[in-house]
Amino acid sequence: MASSREVLVAPHEVPAEPGQRQHWADNLRVLVIAVVVVFHTATAYLGGSAWYYMDRTTSKAWTTAFFPAYAISVYALGPLFLVAGWFSARSLAHKDAGAFARSRLLRLGVPLLVFVFVIDRLAAYLGDLGRNEHPTLSHYWGVPPQSGGPYEVGSLWFVAALLTFSLAYALLRRARPLPVAHRWSGPQVMAAAALLIAVTAGLMWQRWQLGDGQTFMKMQWGEWPQGAGLFALGVWAGEAGTLENLTAWGRRLGWTALTAATLWAALAVYLKMSGHLESAFHGAGWLVMLNVLLYGIISVAFTVWFTALIRARWSGSGPLRARAGRASYAAYVLHSVVLTAVMVAFASLALAPELTFLIVAIVAVPLCFLAGYATRQVPGISRIL
């Protein structure tokens, strides 16, 4: 993820001191990553996708109540893709494509490899340990591993996607260095991004649905169209000079997102009750087209509205917030093993899953950021994380 320490604003917005951090971007990352940790805690205790350690509730009421949170999680990482695209455009404007690509390989590729071959393995080991399976640590490495399942990117599919988009962007600008962002207005480019997400998602979902855990290395291909569209939208804003071309429409987009989300929820309820929920992801019928169109609209409208809200309402910084902002990327990379360790530590208390969820979430969020901050104090690590 690009560093907000870079000068990434339009000429008339350049801060007085070079290298000044964009505090609103730090705050946005802290909030989104904290939500990711809480969501992954919920999947272990309340339902949803699989986690390294699970102690699921048997209450259908809690599982049903968790569904809206799962629906929101579909759009949770959108702001990070948008901001990453914006940072990438401003960064590439100050360095050649080769240098930009090398920096992305260092800051995204290296953590991804460490996660796949170290962090994910340790999290799987801790999860099995929490289930009293008495695992042997060495069995979690090998070709293939004897324990812990195959190697996978897991929760770092976001980093894998961002690395792919960043390298593709560098290649594009090397072949065609002159940006064309000024030819489009903000509403036009947002409409184009929503349409791009809708079309590519419709094609991708024919093979891989949202949250499909059976993809290669759990890459979550069904999520990539949204990420690509929002990254491209951020790039456009960066090349145009300022995010204001998008965020100025924040209030209207908030209402647009709410309206589209209401229609999307109504469609989901209708399909669920009629037993045709799967039909909204396959084929070329009107249900599929309506589903992907609403998905594209919500992806863009919610992301830009949320980003505008953070920029307007939460742009300040204090000592604790600044440290959390600097540690946010490391916290995201490490949260799988930290969160699983906390879950295993509380497993012996034999509490109700619902209560354990609340306790673990409260403890794990600050611990993940603390682990990220501590890791960055190791010499050389801050250049990567």
Model-derived features: positions:
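Alpha-helical transmembrane segments and their immediate juxtamembrane cytosolic regions
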Residues: 2-385
